[in-house]
């Protein structure tokens, strides 16, 4: 708790010296999100994005999306992820999270495209393979579903996603 207070003071001091600095605003937004102050974090991500010299606005849109998802606002989060992908089409955080949202909306073709793009970036992780498997399952594509199940079993046998597969808990 003491370190959290010191970190907060350091960020506030830095923002006092450079209130429009994109990196400071982004990092303070991340700090707020990680310390369960998600609604407060959005203001700092948006402040970072406002700076025309800030070089990674997609990163702040993605982070805003994640923090907004944590507050149970998928519609608002969706908007942030879409903006991130407009600026950086291969943003992994935006791809996987928007893929999850599209899956929950029943938009399987778009969810499939997003997760496939994500999997091309790093050959997939347990989360993305699990999402791909569930997309194919809902789409009735049993061969593709089995392929993702095999990859999950082979590459991530100890993962919570594989455990859910073994239990038949698909949602």
Where are these regions (language model features)?
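Terminal, low-structured helical/coil segments at or just beyond the last alpha-helical repeat
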Residues: 120-171
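Residue-level recognition of tetratricopeptide repeat
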Residues: 21, 55-57, 91, 125, ...
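Canonical tetratricopeptide repeat
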Residues: 27, 61-63, 97, 131
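TPR alpha-solenoid repeat register
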Residues: 24, 58-60, 94, 128, ...
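Structural marker of alpha-solenoid helical repeat scaffolds
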Residues: 17-18, 51-53, 87, 120-122, ...
